[in-house]
Amino acid sequence: RSLYVSLLTFMCFSACQGSEELEQSQEKEYTVSIMARIGKTVSGARYLQDHENAIASFSKTDDIGVFMDNDSAVRWIFDGTSWTTEKSVFWKDKNQEHTFYAYYPHSGSKAESKENIKMPSLDSQNGTWENIDQYDFLVASRKLSYDTDLGNVAFSGDYSFKHVLSLLKINIKGEGDMAQAVIDKIRLEGNGLTTQGYYSFETNSITISETPKETFQITPSHTMNNQDVSFYFILNGGENDGNIDPKAVKNHSVNLTIEYTRNNKYYITRRDDLSPGLLSGCIHKYNIVVKDGNVIITGGSISGWTPGNEEEDIVINGEEINPQTNNML
């Protein structure tokens, strides 16, 4: 009897051990792994940029949300080397293709489903580059099977993360009326520029479900001292079908108002249609001079925001003069 009990115990132990080894083997074999990049030319992984022309990449503690088919979104966190989850995600099979939908950031966004992802709020920006990543929103998607890359889902190359919103850069020259001025307020006006947006992977577009916010304002209180200064804004833009001509965009024009102080006098200068139309996924750059109370565009460009884009840049030519109404208070 003693021998029988010992044999039975050994068999149970062996079975349990075999089951654990099988589970570990399956876990190792069928676990989903993630690799994510921003743009085709990026070799790193955050949204980390010194300026708008630098390479963008992910940094430590950044997080993304990833849907597998119609499952709920899973949070993946970048540890500086790789992407990890609190709980492993497994492939449902080895041979069938599955679609992965990813968005950044997971924090600051809320995803009820892949058709209704609440994007970061845009109405608390201060116009500086340093915190611009808090307001950005990027997406990526890819359809593949386990056998495509031994379980790895690489959001890179043609499948890399892309910017969904528009980046507006306004560079104010430290000359003319602004040489020794203090910029008190900058106001942007347009259709739904900072209204809360919701992204859908089904339509690959943003929907606005709230009353459009027509005005956005910052109060930099910036002293020029003959130096140029740039302000950055992430805003809602019109759909981008590959044609980055802003004249093709409707209902996303931007009016600019600058309130400033010079020699103890308060001025307001305005430029209607600074941009005739903002495009999703594009950077709109405008260099301006305030001269004799007029906002004059001295140059700029419109280009794709995502690194490695194949869109041709549009150069904005400078103007001789732009008659506007200038008010002194």
Locate the predicted segments by residue.
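Sec-dependent bacterial lipoprotein signal peptides
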Residues: R1-S14
